[in-house]
Swiss-Prot record:
The chain crosses the membrane at residues 4-24, 45-65, 75-95, 117-137, 171-191, 217-237, 253-275, 280-299. This is Uncharacterized membrane protein YvoD. The keyword Glycoprotein does not apply. It is a multi-pass membrane protein. Keywords: Cell membrane, Membrane, Transmembrane, Transmembrane helix. It comes from Bacillus subtilis (strain 168). InterPro entries: Gate_dom. Signal peptide: none annotated. It is found in: Cell membrane.
Length: 312
């Protein structure tokens, strides 16, 4: 048990270090840019487009960071902005569906999934969900409170003050990251080394069949749901090869997982943003289930002779 704990602790610190190298400079840079004309110019340029999603122009900053880098970079961008609870929730939903596009799309390509399909699903889900939430939710107008980040005080009047503000926000962002990631990595290490991931795989078999996939897809699903697409890439690729998962089932699995993966981590990381995370999780799971079942049904209806025959 001690070895497992230490291995998980080491993985937690390693992950914190890796992601902290993104969180710290991104938070520092974006905070400093807020005091320059660059941010105002960018906001004016994209405000009309962001209005479709019920967001202010500056909300595009975390969207770009999250999609080009990762979810943590997007959250770092949010931490530097004064947004309403509704805006933060919409951003959280969009980023939960659509983040880390470069790396996670590459993972999809490695198991034979068309990158265009994955991008279309993720970007489409993010856009549609934002528009729907903006239309049906009329609350959440109060300013969001960001965990350790205190309410904004008077703007600093010197470059030294600006730098101090940026360093403080960047440091607190890394501390919040460590408080979430380290315990999470320890738990995942125990699950992996004690064989619980394989047990979850067996338990998940009926669910994968309900979604229209064969039960040999369950290990891939468990890995994606618990670890995520980026961190679980190696395990998922090996599971596809070892279990003989068909191209159809792999495509369906990835469609589900791009909408709902790393359900523990990608939900908990939003807690410091001061938004309700249970509705966020419910939206992800419900969307993933309904979308996957609909595509599986349509695929079976259009190509009944191909189901289960193609292998990667």
């Amino acid at each position: 048990m001690k070895k497992i704990f230490l291995a998980g602790l080491a993985a937690g610190f390693q992950t914190t270090w890796t992601l902290g190298k993104v969180i710290f400079p991104v938070t520092l840079l974006v905070t400093l840019l807020q005091h320059t004309p660059v941010m105002d110019w960018l906001v004016r340029l994209i405000t009309p487009v962001m209005g479709l999603f019920g967001l202010s122009g500056e909300a595009a900053i975390p969207l770009v960071l999250g999609n080009m880098l990762n979810l943590y970079a997007g959250i770092a961008g949010i931490l530097t902005l004064d947004l309403s609870v509704k805006e933060v929730f919409i951003l959280a939903v969009m980023l939960s569906f659509c983040h880390n596009l470069i790396i996670e799309s590459t993972v999809a390509a490695k198991v034979g999934i068309r990158i265009g399909v994955i991008l279309a699903v993720r970007i489409g889900l993010a856009a549609v969900s934002a528009i729907v939430i903006n239309l049906i939710w009329h609350g959440g107008k109060e300013t969001a409170q960001y965990g350790f980040i205190a309410a904004k005080s008077a703007a600093p009047d010197s470059w030294l003050g600006m730098l101090a503000e940026a360093l403080t926000k960047a440091g607190l962002g890394v501390l919040q990251l460590a408080a979430i990631v380290i315990p999470l990595m320890i738990i995942i290490q125990f699950l992996r080394d004690l064989g619980w991931l394989y047990r979850f795989s067996r338990w998940l078999s009926p669910f994968t069949q309900l979604l229209g996939m064969n039960k040999n897809t369950s290990m891939t699903m468990v890995t994606g749901l618990t670890i995520g697409l980026a961190y679980g890439a190696g395990v998922m690729i090996k599971a596809v090869e070892d279990d003989g998962v068909s191209k159809r089932d792999m495509t369906l699995a990835f469609i589900f997982l791009v909408a709902c993966h790393a359900v523990v981590e990608d939900t908990l990381v939003f807690i410091p943003l001061g938004i309700p995370v249970w509705p966020l999780l419910l939206i992800r799971v419900t969307t993933a289930v309904l979308l996957t079942m609909a595509i599986a049904h349509t695929w079976k209806k259009w190509k009944p002779s191909a189901v289960g025959k193609e292998a990667i």
